[in-house]
């Protein structure tokens, strides 16, 4: 008789039912983490064109990649939450759900009659997560928000860029949106753990603004200590040197020395040991005070060889160093493949799940995002009110 190895569970949240009322990016990113980790996620979309991001490019055929990344593996149903029949289906979902996630502007769920207090009456174990631009409380609670607005109002744009340049959005990604999604996931996971002990649900209130402030870290600490907002410093580190982009003979690369020992090792390997004993550079506070002169001295030595040479020898000397890669080069790194961070979903490549948990599969292929109302008929039947059944 041939023994078969039992299949691994889908993820630690296998069996969890998530009702997903979120749209665009900050909420869907949080619920996608739950989905990747095994939860069954039902995305409720409004009549018409559904989630706005279905109309966002880039496209592969008629498929929005923007929408696909943060909705892969979910089910879609169109419900009009002002229609009595659809409201009944929604409430039946709530009765059976573990988690409800929403990112409407504060007040919308109240007007629909679906705030936490009302839904907790029919499901006291419900974890109800709200993610908004500025939170459910405070003078800016009802202020409309997109990623760039939150970056501007959090101070991060004023702290980003070069001293002689304008305030700069953290580009290449929607940082504030993703902060909201990550902290929504953290709140949901924490509340689920607490529910195991208390048997009770909870209301989670997270915001893009709060998350971005938390990520500001050293900038807020600098202001707290000095009373002054930190100046823009380009690619340098606010407290350590050398910690910057440096020009080699052919192209730039990055060197990061977090202590005096690493700085001495760097000076030795690039053939400039005298820099380690130069009074301007002996200790970190000296190097910080003379950062411009330090960079000039290092780049003089680095100009003698191409970046590939320095990346090799500096790395072998134990000093943190790295190449400057574009997105295509990063995607093609063997490390990216080794970590399964480019996966196939719905026939297209996209970022994988960065959370690796022993005992659970991390599949290279995941289900794609649903078409609008793709599972609508089946879900209406599954969650029909008892009297309708």
Swiss-Prot record:
InterPro entries according to UniProt: CoA-transferase_III_domain, CoA-Trfase_fam_III, CoA-Trfase_III_dom3_sf, CoA-Trfase_III_dom_1_sf
Catalytic residue list: 237
The EC number(s) this enzyme carries: 2.8.3.19
GO terms, molecular function: acetyl-CoA:oxalate CoA-transferase
Key words of the record: Transferase
Enzyme class, UniProt record, top EC level: transferase
Domain of life: Bacteria
Catalytic activity reported: oxalate + acetyl-CoA = oxalyl-CoA + acetate
Any Pfam family matching the protein: CoA_transf_3
Subunit structure: Homodimer.
Reported function: Involved in the catabolism of oxalate and in the adapatation to low pH. ACOCT serves to prime the oxalate-induced acid tolerance response (ATR) cycle by producing substrate for oxalyl-CoA decarboxylase (OXC) and formyl-coenzyme A transferase (FCOCT). Catalyzes the reversible conversion of acetyl-CoA and oxalate to oxalyl-CoA and acetate. It can also use formyl-CoA and oxalate to produce oxalyl-CoA and formate with significantly reduced specific activity.
Entry's family note: Belongs to the CoA-transferase III family.
Protein name, entry field: Acetyl-CoA:oxalate CoA-transferase
């Amino acid at each position: 008789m041939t023994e078969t190895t039992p299949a691994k569970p889908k993820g630690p949240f296998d069996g969890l039912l998530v009702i997903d009322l979120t749209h665009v990016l900050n909420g869907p990113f949080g619920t996608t983490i739950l989905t990747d980790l095994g939860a069954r996620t039902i995305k409720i979309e409004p009549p018409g064109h559904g989630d706005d991001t279905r109309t966002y490019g880039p496209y592969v055929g008629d498929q929005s990649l923007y929408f696909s990344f943060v909705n892969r593996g979910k089910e879609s149903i169109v419900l009009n939450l002002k229609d009595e029949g659809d409201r009944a289906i929604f409430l039946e979902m709530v009765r059976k759900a573990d988690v409800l996630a929403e990112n409407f502007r504060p007040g919308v769920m109240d007007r629909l009659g679906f705030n936490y207090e009302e839904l907790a009456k029919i499901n006291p174990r419900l974890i109800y997560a709200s993610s908004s631009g500025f939170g459910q409380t405070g003078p800016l609670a009802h202020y409309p928000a997109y990623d760039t607005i939150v970056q501007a109002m959090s101070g991060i744009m004023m702290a980003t860029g070069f001293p002689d340049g304008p305030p700069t959005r953290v580009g290449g990604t929607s940082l504030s949106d993703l902060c909201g999604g990550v902290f929504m996931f953290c709140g949901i996971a924490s509340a689920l753990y607490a529910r195991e002990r208390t048997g009770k649900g909870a209301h989670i209130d997270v915001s893009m603004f709060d998350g971005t402030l938390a990520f500001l870290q050293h900038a807020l600490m600098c202001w707290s200590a000095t009373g002054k907002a930190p100046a823009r410093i380009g690619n340098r580190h606010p407290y350590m040197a050398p910690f910057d982009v440096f020009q080699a003979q052919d192209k730039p690369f990055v060197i990061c020395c977090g202590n005096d020992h690493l700085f001495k090792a760097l000076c030795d390997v690039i053939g400039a040991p005298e820099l380690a004993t130069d009074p301007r550079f002996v200790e970190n506070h000296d190097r910080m005070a003379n950062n411009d002169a330090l960079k000039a001295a290092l780049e003089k030595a680095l100009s003698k060889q191409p970046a590939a040479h320095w990346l090799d020898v500096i790395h072998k000397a134990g000093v943190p160093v790295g190449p400057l890669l574009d997105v295509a080069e990063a995607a093609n790194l063997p490390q990216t493949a080794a970590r399964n961070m480019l996966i196939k979903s719905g026939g297209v490549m996209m970022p994988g799940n960065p959370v690796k948990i022993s005992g659970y599969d991390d599949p290279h292929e995941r289900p794609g995002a649903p078409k609008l109302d793709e599972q609508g008929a089946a879900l209406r039947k599954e969650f029909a009110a008892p009297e309708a059944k």
